[in-house]
């Protein structure tokens, strides 16, 4: 099914205003809890060995020029120095000629508060590449050509970028706080503005085979206040499924999303996950064809 460019532009405007896969805002993905270093460099975990996390997301798949996202995280933990080292790279294509690529090196130091609790303090540094290509954008009004505001050539801007955060964890819960892009007061076409995150997750044994993991996250950026409230159920810690509600309380009637996730773990080493997101609110006439695939490995 084809959807005209007007709806494509509406979809892009919605993503800009509602925090979901916007080039001017951080990646909002439904399986972020499994790997967090792109939004909090302290969220590295402390398992010996290395972890690799790969995620791809396409939003509103039946809309022309729909947003597309790619994310790669890698971490390694050393008990000898109580530290984690890693890297995160993400690509966010807004779909109207605007894209951003962000790459950062990650470091986190772990402090054993007592036998039950671990505090992780993290920082990451790198660069952001923002690009606008007018040849990939379809104009609604050709009279814009020639105006002083019209960008006729592809433009790219490279800028430094830094994140910092903290995370405390135990056997049954974790909580974190972070700030991303803390050098940038505001967002532009070529870089993201400062974001603040608070999140938490529990992990509770219900029976010998079943566990529940309630989760909560909150993100603040200027006039955006997005919350995620959800829960995942695990069977033998190998198969999981969950649901989460993700509204922006500043634009509650305009855009909300409900995500349904499922996945499995094989040989205590490999994970595969899938998420399907549905639209609610003013833009619920857009197709609920947002798909997200996740692969991760521990070695």
Where are these regions (language model features)?
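Bacterial N-terminal signal peptides that target proteins for export
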Residues: 2-12
């Amino acid at each position: 099914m084809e959807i005209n460019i007007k709806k494509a532009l509406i979809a892009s405007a919605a993503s800009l205003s509602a925090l979901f896969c916007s080039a001017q805002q951080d990646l909002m993905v439904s399986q972020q809890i499994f790997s967090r270093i792109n939004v909090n460099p302290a969220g590295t975990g402390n398992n010996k060995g290395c972890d690799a996390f790969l995620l791809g997301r396409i939003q509103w798949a039946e809309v022309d020029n729909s947003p597309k996202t790619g994310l790669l995280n890698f971490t390694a933990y050393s008990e000898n120095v109580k530290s984690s080292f890693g890297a995160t790279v993400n690509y966010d294509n807004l779909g109207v000629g605007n894209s951003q690529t962000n790459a950062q090196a990650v470091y986190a130091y772990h402090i054993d508060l007592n036998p039950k609790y671990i505090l992780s303090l993290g920082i990451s540094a790198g660069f952001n590449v923002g690009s606008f290509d007018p040849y990939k954008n379809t104009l609604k009004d050709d009279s814009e050509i020639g105006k002083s505001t019209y960008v006729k050539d592809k433009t790219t801007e490279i800028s430094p970028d830094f994140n910092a955060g903290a995370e405390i964890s135990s056997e049954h819960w974790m909580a974190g706080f972070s700030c991303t892009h803390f050098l940038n007061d505001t967002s532009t076409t070529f870089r993201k503005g400062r974001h603040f995150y608070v999140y938490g997750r529990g992990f509770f044994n219900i029976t010998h085979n079943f566990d529940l993991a309630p989760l909560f996250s909150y993100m603040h950026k200027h006039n955006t206040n997005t919350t995620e409230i959800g829960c995942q159920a695990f069977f033998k810690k190998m198969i999981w499924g969950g649901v989460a509600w993700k509204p922006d309380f500043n634009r509650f009637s305009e855009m909300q999303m409900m995500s349904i996730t499922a996945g499995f773990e094989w040989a205590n080493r490999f994970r595969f996950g899938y998420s399907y997101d549905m639209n609610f609110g003013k833009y619920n006439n857009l197709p609920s064809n947002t798909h997200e695939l996740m692969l991760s490995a521990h070695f």
